[in-house]
Amino acid sequence: MARFPEAEERILNKKICMKCSARNAVRATRCRKCGYTNLRVKNKDVRRG
């Protein structure tokens, strides 16, 4: 997807809040915006629509 592995790591290595869809750090345990604790890892696969 990205041209460089460093860029891909920076873009895809995130957690997403299930409530407000905010991007958070990988080591986060709660959302930085709303405080929700249900975070998922950002999907790595490319979806074509």
UniProtKB/Swiss-Prot annotation:
One of the record's GO molecular function terms: structural constituent of ribosome
For this protein, the record's Pfam families field holds:
Ribosomal_L40e
**GO cellular component terms, A-Z:** ribonucleoprotein complex; ribosome
Q: Does the keyword Ribosomal protein apply?
A: yes
* Gene3D superfamilies referenced in this protein's UniProt entry, alphabetically: 4.10.1060.50
Instruction: Cite the entry's keywords alphabetically.
Output: Ribonucleoprotein, Ribosomal protein
UniProt-listed SUPFAM superfamilies: Zn-binding ribosomal proteins (SSF57829)
Instruction: Please indicate if the UniProt record lists Ligase as a keyword.
Output: no
> What SMART domains does the annotation carry?
Ribosomal_L40e
Which pairs are disulfide-linked?
none
User: Which InterPro entries does the annotation name?
Assistant: Ribosomal_eL40_arc, Ribosomal_eL40_dom, Ribosomal_eL40_sf, Ribosomal_zn-bd
GO biological-process terms attached to the record: translation
Taxonomically, the superkingdom here is Archaea
State the similarity comment.
Belongs to the eukaryotic ribosomal protein eL40 family.
Q: Which PANTHER family match?
A: 50S RIBOSOMAL PROTEIN L40E, LARGE RIBOSOMAL SUBUNIT PROTEIN EL40
Q: What is the protein name for this chain?
A: Large ribosomal subunit protein eL40
